[in-house]
Amino acid sequence: PSAEPSSMTTVDDLIDRLEAEAAADADPATTPDVGIIMGSDSDLPVMEDAYEALNELGFAEQTDFDEAPDARFTYESYVVSAHRTPELMYAYGETATERGLDVIIAGAGGKSADLPNMTASIAYPVPVIGVPVQEKSVDSVIGMPTGAPIVAVDAGKSYNAALSAAQVLAREHDAIEERLVDLHEDQKGGVADVSADLHDRGIDGFRER
């Protein structure tokens, strides 16, 4: 006998999920603080740096809205296409506040990278940080009219987008501010080590490290 076909998640299923979570009136301490969305899973190699930055700051990924991880600060991620699944994009933006999101990082590529700026308009006043996945996506992401704000980083700089998201949260959470300061100090220390090595070893010795 043929195998049973595997069930597939539909766009309507995801919209129902988001709307149910929005209606749940969950404790903000248990909901994701940062939402990471991207237009395609092919954007993930660029967007992975955002996960790295948040993990370095002590965030944890939340994959179940009803069961938060032990970490106080969390993030979630979805693939949301502005062109192929516009209904999902609208649902994600419209439910952002009720679902407890404080900031959204949105990445998209191509010349019509509309996900970040459309999400910024829909989710307003939740801040959205746009990540152009490619250089050709920059103009599309930053091209917002007066009164429709979006924060954007340079092409491919999802790590910086995550730091900016953490800065937004740091205004209300001292623990995140402390982690940002510590991370900055670590990065400064790394530059100092390299600088001393170059000076003390000379260029030839430095290259042979």
Locate the predicted segments by residue.
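Glycine-rich phosphate-binding loop
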Residues: 87-132
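Structural motif
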Residues: 33-36, 76, 102-104, 126-130, ...
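Short, Lys/Arg-enriched N-terminal segments with co-localized hydrophobic residues
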Residues: 1-7
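Short, solvent-exposed amphipathic alpha-helical segments in soluble enzyme
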Residues: 50-56, 93-94, 120-123, 167-168
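C-terminal binding/interaction regions
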Residues: 10-18, 23-25, 29-31, 42, ...
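Short, ordered loop/turn segments at secondary-structure junctions
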Residues: 40-41, 80-82, 109-110, 133-136, ...
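Glycine-rich phosphate/diphosphate-binding loop of Rossmann-like nucleotide-binding domains
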Residues: 24-82
